[in-house]
Design a protein with these regions (language model features):
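Residue-level marker for buried hydrophobic side chains located in beta-strands
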Residues: 3-5, 34, 59, 145-147, ...
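Divalent-metal (often Zn2+) His-rich catalytic cores of metallo-beta-lactamase-fold enzymes
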Residues: 48, 52-55, 116, 139, ...
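Conserved beta-strand hairpin/beta-sheet module of binuclear metal-dependent hydrolase folds
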Residues: 1-23, 137-149, 154
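Core dinuclear metal-dependent hydrolase active-site scaffold
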Residues: 110-140
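Active-site HxH/HxHxD metal-binding segment of metal-dependent hydrolases
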Residues: 12-13, 21-109
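Histidine-centered catalytic micro-motifs
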Residues: 33-43, 127-135, 189-195
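Active-site metal-binding loops of divalent metal-dependent hydrolases
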Residues: 7-9, 38, 63-65, 130-132, ...
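Short glycine-enriched, charge-decorated loop/helix-capping segments at active-site entrances
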Residues: 159-166
Length: 209
């Protein structure tokens, strides 16, 4: 079986299929999707994945972001009603359509801080709010890999903190990084910037100072 962490923008299903195939993983093996948070570029292709899969895929997310993913509440960062006329006018028509008609899908199971999923030799859920209220990061115990989501980014191969422009609560987001310090991490995967190898804990410690 296979699991997928986040689903990209709307319309990226074929890219997901191709990437899985290149990694030697059939799309037909996909049994679970874990969402790190509610942002459009993380939940975008979820409805397409669920529609195209022959499996009963389980969707996981934190309870704080669940109503936004399910469409009960508008996405916090792309709600047209919260944008100025100037901001709205500057958007391409395609983005206006997406903001007015965001993807939505049912969350089957909500995740809690410290919870462990049995996939991949054990995945520990780390509640890392700030970027969004229900942001989570995932620690794959067997491979000592941290999937940070948007809690951190990688720029020019260097691990950096959350991006202020897209983070709803920067103080909370920085505080959330402290959760990583007690973990034995060898590799960090960030949604923006990709993979970073951790050679010493100072790389993480410097981000919370």
């Amino acid at each position: 079986m296979a699991i997928l962490i986040d689903t990209g923008m709307p319309g990226q299903l074929e890219q997901i299929r191709l990437t899985m195939s290149e990694a030697g993983v059939s799309f037909d093996k996909l049994k679970a999707v874990i969402l790190t948070h509610q942002d459009l570029d993380h939940i975008g292709s979820l409805p397409e994945i669920l529609n195209q899969s022959n499996n009963n895929i389980e969707v996981y997310a934190h309870a704080h972001d669940k109503p936004y993913i399910e469409g009960t509440l508008p996405l916090l960062k792309t709600d047209p009603n919260k944008m100025s006329k100037e901001q709205w006018a500057a958007l391409p028509e395609q983005m206006k359509f997406l903001y007015k008609n965001p993807p939505k899908a049912k969350v089957d199971q909500t995740l809690e801080d410290g919870q462990e999923l049995s996939y991949c030799g054990g995945i520990q859920i780390i509640f890392t709010p700030g970027h969004t209220p229900g942001h989570i990061s995932l620690y794959l115990k067997q491979s000592k890999t941290l999937v940070a989501g948007d809690a951190m980014v990688v720029a020019d191969g260097v691990l950096q903190g959350p991006v202020p422009q897209t983070t709803l609560d920067m103080t909370t987001a920085i505080h959330s990084l402290e959760r990583f310090l007690d973990l034995d991490i060898e590799t960090v995967i960030c949604y923006h910037g990709g993979l970073c190898t951790i050679t010493e804990k100072k790389q993480l410690e410097n981000l919370v100072k």
